[in-house]
């Protein structure tokens, strides 16, 4: 932070560097390996967000597995994480590593809060991460309306350009979600 060898900090890479790197990208679907020099590479879906995978690198008989966030087996939108291969070295993100997720019924809590607030004539404002959490909240509200647990005429607005774009991606790739197609249609 604040350190550079240059009087005016220079970017780490140029637009041309980025374009050259993008031109070299080769899609590799989960479950299929590829060889890059002497390193075998593979991806395993981890159920966190659309496309989230652990990467496995195999070189000289040693296996390294790296993953960012790993999803939960009972996630509302995403399928459960797949088992990653055994590893000699495992690197994994650990924001919630020392916490157990509460087993509370989030939908029931949300229904109660929304219903109580609407009865008082109030509005509900729910800040949420634009990718993943916003889509899960939209689905939960959709299900609560369908079940009559919150007023069906309750307007719901997604007021974040990034969340709207992410929701469009979730809809486009709805086959990767764990929800039925009819529910995924409402994500658009």
Please state what every model-predicted region is.
Residues 133, 151, 155-172:
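Short, conserved secondary-structure transition motifs
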Residues 1-136, 142-149:
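His/Asp/Glu-rich metal-coordinating catalytic cores
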């Amino acid at each position: 932070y604040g350190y550079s060898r240059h009087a005016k900090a220079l970017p780490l890479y140029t637009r041309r560097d980025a374009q050259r790197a993008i031109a070299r990208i080769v899609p590799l679907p989960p479950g299929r390996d590829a060889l890059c020099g002497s390193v075998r590479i593979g991806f395993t879906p981890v159920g966190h967000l659309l496309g989230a995978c652990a990467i496995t690198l195999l070189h000289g008989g040693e296996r390294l597995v790296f993953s960012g966030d790993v999803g939960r087996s009972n996630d509302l939108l995403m399928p459960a994480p797949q088992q990653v291969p055994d590893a000699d070295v495992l690197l994994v993100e650990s924001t919630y590593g020392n916490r157990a997720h509460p087993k509370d019924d989030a939908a029931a809590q949300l229904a109660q809060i929304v219903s109580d607030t609407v009865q008082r004539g109030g509005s509900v404002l729910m800040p949420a991460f634009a990718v993943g959490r916003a889509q899960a909240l939209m689905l939960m509200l959709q299900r609560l309306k369908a079940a009559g647990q919150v007023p069906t005429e309750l307007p719901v607005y997604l007021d974040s350009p990034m969340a709207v774009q992410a929701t469009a991606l979730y809809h486009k790739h709805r086959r990767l979600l764990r929800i039925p197609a009819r529910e995924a249609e409402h994500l658009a």
